[in-house]
Structure formats: structure tokens, C-alpha cells
Amino acid sequence: MNLYFFTFTGNSRKIAEMVADELAVELREIKSLRLPYIAWLLLSFVPCMAVKIDVQPPTGKEIILCFPKWTFNCPPVTAFLKKFAKGREIRMIICYGGFDERRYAEFYKSFALKCGAKKADYLLVKRRELRENPEKVRDNIKKWLKIS
């Protein structure tokens, strides 16, 4: 199993670190251009837009991918799925703070399948809950991943 994350604020990294601790797996960061916030905001309005990423390629057939909910698109995540989803099971943990998170998650589930993933599912994590009750978030992740 490979564990990846993309983060702008650090929240998705915190979630990925929880998963890495529970599964005892290596954590891999999806790196991209360091653009100002306004540039990422504009890019997030363009569905399916990808950007160049720097990441260690996955070795297994199962991937856990932690990333933020942006407006319509998170370009580094889109690039990752276009490049690596084919033939793999993709489990996404999406951190959100605003609204419309379910539509966004369903879009990425569908997108992963269109990119050739054998299976795709997701877990939503509210940013506020991550800050205020990280142990509850950890418990929810463990249940979702079926870790005792």
C-alpha cells in the first residue's frame, strides 16, 4: 500500500501522518509548483486541469491519497490520478472546510475510475473537526480503513 498526500495549509499532511502511524507505511508527498494562493484559487475553478508534479511513483496496487477540497479541482491531485490511477485501488481522504464536499468527492471518485482505477472510494474529514477533535478523526479513519 502506498500513502500519498498533497497539502497547501498542512491539514492533509496531518491526516496522512495519522494514516501512516496506523498502517506503519511510508508517507509520500505530491510536490508541485509553489504558486501564490490566488493562482491556486484560479486553477481550482478549471475542472480536470492538471499541473506538473514531482512524486515518487507508486509500487503497489493500493493507494491512499489525502488532499484538500478546493473549489472544483485540485490540479496536483488531478495530475496524480491521470498518471497513476490505472489498474489501482484508490482510497481518498478529503479534508474540507466549506461546502459542497460530497459533490467534490463524488467527482474525484468518478474521475479516478475514468483514469482507470479498479476501485475508488473516499472519506471526508471536516477541517474544524481535525483541529478540535483529532482523536475522533483518527477513529473515523481507522473504521474506514478497517483497522482495529
Swiss-Prot record:
SUPFAM superfamilies assigned: Flavoproteins
Entry-linked InterPro entries: Flavoprotein-like_sf
Gene3D superfamilies noted in UniProt: 3.40.50.360
Protein name as catalogued: Uncharacterized protein AF_2332
